[in-house]
Structures are given as C-alpha cells and as structure tokens.
Amino acid sequence: MALGDVRNDWTLEEIKDIMNQPFNDLMFQAQTVHRQHFNPNEIQTSTLVNIKSGGCAEDCAYCSQSARNQTEVEKEQMMEVQEVIEQAMAAKEKGATRLCMGAAWRNPTKKDFPRVLEMVRVVKDLGLETCLTLGMLNDDQVKQLKEAGLDYYNHNLDTSEAFYPKIITTRSYQDRLDTIDKVQEAGINVCSGGIIGMGEQHKDRAELIRTFGTMRHHPNSVPINLLVPVEGTPLAHMKDKTDSFEFIRVIATARIVMPQTYVRLSAGRMELTDEAQALCFLAGANSIFYGDKLLTTDNPEAGHDEQLFAKLGIQMQQNAKVEAAAKKLAEQTTELTA
C-alpha cells in the first residue's frame, strides 16, 4: 500500500522504523500524508469543561483527580446544565467547534447520567459538536448517548499495554479496549490517546500507536498529551521534560499510521515553545484544546493561540469541515472491513 493509505495491519517493527528514521525524512513523510487528507493550514479546536471534579475511584498515577492521590483538588458536585450552557456559549463565541465534557468517574452513576444526557442535547442545540469522557460505559449507557446525539466519546489508553500496569491498577487495559469497542459499535466517533513522559520507553510509544493503528476503525481523534507532573501524585517526581523532538516524532508517526485521524495537541502544551508547536503542526497535528484550562491543568490562553495561528497562517476549522472529515473516515473504514 502507498504512503497515506489507511491500513489496519501495522506491525510494531514498521512503526518503530517510521519513528526512528532521520527527523527530516519523518517530517517530510508526515507532512506529505497530512496534505493528502487535510488542509495543512487548518486546526480543529475543542474546549474542555470539567463537569464533575475530583473524587475518582481510579488510581491513575498521573491524575490530580484520583481520590487515592494526595492532591489539592477537592471533590465537587456535578455541574448544573445551565452552567454548561454558559460555558458552551462562551467556547463557541471564541471559535471552538466542539465542547468536551469530562467527569472524574470510574463510570457514570445512575443518578447523574440523565443530567449528562441533557447536557449533550443542549450543547448540540447550540450548534457545537459534543464529546464526553466519563470512564467505562455499559451497553445501555452507550445506547442512550447515541440516542441523545453524542458525537464523540473520549476514552484514552494512556500508554502501551505492557507499561500500563505501572500507571493504573484499578482498571485493566482490556476494560478500556472494551469500552472503545462498545462506542464504535454504536456508531459514536472515538477519541482516544495517550500520555508521553511517564517513564515509558520508545517501544511503548510505538506500541501505543500500533494499538490505535490496528483497530478495526482508527479513532477519529487521537490526543497526544505531555505529562504534567502534579504534586501529590505518584508521578510528581517526573520533573525531567520530555525532549521536544521526541514528542514531535510521536506526532509525526501517529499522522503517518492514521492518515485520516485528527491528531490533537492536548495537555502539556504549556511546556512547548511556539517553535515546537509549529513543528508539531508541520508533523500533522491538526487539533488543539482551546482555552486556558484542561480539567485541572493550565493551558495556553486563547489569545496566545490566536497570535500563534496568525504567525503561521493557520485558520480555525469550521464545523461543516469537521463533519465532512469524520464522514470520510467512516466511509473509508467501512470499506476496509466490508
């Protein structure tokens, strides 16, 4: 198959070879693939809202919201629908095309789930795409989310299956894969990514990308995060910054392996210089979280992003183009599995 074709049969060795090739060759290939499937001067923007903070039962070693970690994040009640409406309107006014709503849960509670469904409906009524990250889902919850009109569901794999037990013990890797399967089976777009800088090896990064690249349907979007060490978590000691070039290699490899997927710069952008971000965009990153907060983590201010986009000649993508790209990916993956 040619460079830029959608494949689901990637081997680990192929991906390691892509990631480890000379930097200029990697960047050229990634940009070539990117231009085959996307406008290289457009960025999709999402805003992330924390609809329920703290008190999560999971033991994710990086997370400030785990009840098992000794952080300063306090458990809060779930946000009211009206507050979500206000945040959605503000995000839309600033140019975001999607509102991602996150709750610190192992899985949604029966009591709170109806309010989540209402949030999906009201945000869609405002003309924004909707995304949720709520933890694991059962079949009935997936069905209800589909009926409510949910566009995307985020469920990150975080790292490779081999390294995963060093980061999380309360939920298995297979649990995460099963939730992704349920969401895809229901026809909801999947958003799933990972975190770089948790002590993993190069092979773990390659294996994570291979896992996504060999899924029956590639995720519609893959957020790539840089670890933000939080005091009170087991990874608070990980103070050595991941080399920017290593991070850019992950972005470029994800672009080549998943040609039609949105590759999103997520948490940790505060640690990247404008020049490093520009190289990420050149490597095929075409989505960011837009707004000064990502759950409990700081993010570049919207005004700074706008200035950077202006310097680079980048435009923020409009909803219709996002929908067209999602449809194209769905059609392509259907053909592959027919």
Curated annotation (Swiss-Prot):
Residues 41-269 form the Radical SAM core domain. Belongs to the radical SAM superfamily. Biotin synthase family. [2Fe-2S] cluster binds at C100, C131, C191, R264. Its EC number is 2.8.1.6. GO terms for biological process: biotin biosynthetic process. Pathway: Cofactor biosynthesis; biotin biosynthesis; biotin from 7,8-diaminononanoate: step 2/2. It catalyses: (4R,5S)-dethiobiotin + (sulfur carrier)-SH + 2 reduced [2Fe-2S]-[ferredoxin] + 2 S-adenosyl-L-methionine = (sulfur carrier)-H + biotin + 2 5'-deoxyadenosine + 2 L-methionine + 2 oxidized [2Fe-2S]-[ferredoxin]. [4Fe-4S] cluster binds at C56, C60, C63. The gene is bioB. It is an enzyme of class 2 (transferase). Keywords: 2Fe-2S, 4Fe-4S, Biotin biosynthesis, Iron, Iron-sulfur, Metal-binding, S-adenosyl-L-methionine, Transferase. This is Biotin synthase. One of its GO terms (molecular function) is 4 iron, 4 sulfur cluster binding. The keyword Transferase applies. Its cofactor is [4Fe-4S] cluster; [2Fe-2S] cluster. PANTHER family: BIOTIN SYNTHASE (PTHR22976), BIOTIN SYNTHASE, MITOCHONDRIAL (PTHR22976:SF2). It comes from Hydrogenovibrio crunogenus (strain DSM 25203 / XCL-2) (Thiomicrospira crunogena). Catalyzes the conversion of dethiobiotin (DTB) to biotin by the insertion of a sulfur atom into dethiobiotin via a radical-based mechanism. Binds 1 [4Fe-4S] cluster. The cluster is coordinated with 3 cysteines and an exchangeable S-adenosyl-L-methionine. Binds 1 [2Fe-2S] cluster. The cluster is coordinated with 3 cysteines and 1 arginine. InterPro entries: Aldolase_TIM (IPR013785), BATS_dom (IPR010722), Biotin_synth/BioAB (IPR002684), Biotin_synthase (IPR024177), Elp3/MiaA/NifB-like_rSAM (IPR006638), rSAM (IPR007197). Homodimer.
